[in-house]
């Protein structure tokens, strides 16, 4: 009888990818995935530490799991093995055992390949096991072959960690220094997912355009080199990459957006702030004019490219003028979609110890204003698509029986009513008939 594995994933797409790999890792040891936490023999929380709210969600979920464990005990069942993985594990370590002593294993994002051994020790009644080593090579060398198919669109991790040390960010402390997988590893995994009917590959990294992986004859490949290499794979129709840092947008990568048809015309390029003063305080290593220059060059390379970004409001020392500079940048760039957040001080980062923290009510007010402008731009872009024909990759079922959902080249969700489920996994021409803030509606031509 197989054992059941339940994984709950928080945060970024890198965590989503890691969770798939954890499933692959544990499958040979008899663990099959379940979506029902109540039947799980192992419960893994793959966590995010980017903001305080995200971290506290982990502890709230652990509280619910404790109640579940008590219920199992009352029913005469063995308790599930509880694992906290990911960035909260890396950042808080032994503190997790102090706050939640019923947790069995704490494992960082670079160490989860050791989970089979750690789990076997818990089965032998060892307690409070922890592995927070930063050995990126070991992680990637020990990743299993792809077992669980991700579907029509697949994530592949090519780079981890970050050397930028932005003063608001915990990534260098939780994911470690920048490390790139070899071209051979990435290519082999790409071939595997395409053989399982993936049509789109999204290359992942905390700073993906800093990729410098070893290729044939020890040649170092840039991200542009890697994308060109992967574009040669038959039956692979779309390529994307995320998340990028402006200072690593090289000439060859920008030019590739104009020459490689498989590279989608949508780029997530976070700027965080439109104020030169705040950009400097954040240690972003560029100013607003540098960012504008990259945007202009991308649009020269490919006129139909659409941009996305991240913004943080209320960073320590942010004045009304600084916030107005951010609004000005947003209005000048005109984004297709964006993510925006209030600054959240993270322990151990330089921003957290500054004495000029912004009051919460001011951060909330600024976020509301910014999100209103971003929503206006997003809706305007979506409405501009009405009446056009777009190539949509259908990758999932909708809520209703005859509904399927796909993605445009610009990452917009498109809903159609069509009982023909054979369209799933295919790229189809769709005429867009209706636009909302977060989605489009269309009809098959």
Swiss-Prot record:
**GO MF annotation list:** 4 iron, 4 sulfur cluster binding; metal ion binding; N6-isopentenyladenosine methylthiotransferase activity
Instruction: Please indicate if the UniProt record lists S-adenosyl-L-methionine as a keyword.
Output: yes
Cofactor(s) needed, names only, are: [4Fe-4S] cluster
UniProt binding sites for [4Fe-4S] cluster 1: 12, 48, 87
What keywords were assigned to this record? Answer: 4Fe-4S, Cytoplasm, Iron, Iron-sulfur, Metal-binding, S-adenosyl-L-methionine, Transferase, tRNA processing
Q: Indicate where this protein is primarily found.
A: cytoplasm
Chain ranges of the Radical SAM core domain: 148-380
* Signal peptide annotation: none
Q: Where in the cell is it found?
A: Cytoplasm
UniProt remark on cofactor binding: Binds 2 [4Fe-4S] clusters. One cluster is coordinated with 3 cysteines and an exchangeable S-adenosyl-L-methionine.
Which CDD domains does the entry mention? Answer: Radical_SAM
PROSITE patterns this protein is in?
Answer: MTTASE_N (PS51449), MTTASE_RADICAL (PS01278), RADICAL_SAM (PS51918), TRAM (PS50926)
Entry EC number(s): 2.8.4.3
Residues recorded as binding [4Fe-4S] cluster 2, renumbered to this chain, are: 162, 166, 169
* Limits of the MTTase N-terminal domain: 3-124
Q: Which positions fall inside the TRAM domain? A: 383-445
GO CC annotation: what is one?
cytosol
- Outline what the protein does: Catalyzes the methylthiolation of N6-(dimethylallyl)adenosine (i(6)A), leading to the formation of 2-methylthio-N6-(dimethylallyl)adenosine (ms(2)i(6)A) at position 37 in tRNAs that read codons beginning with uridine.
Tell me, how does this one assemble? Answer: Monomer.
As for family, the record states: Belongs to the methylthiotransferase family. MiaB subfamily.
Note the HAMAP family from the entry: tRNA_metthiotr_MiaB
Designated name of the protein: tRNA-2-methylthio-N(6)-dimethylallyladenosine synthase
Query: Whose protein is this, by species?
Result: Rickettsia typhi (strain ATCC VR-144 / Wilmington)
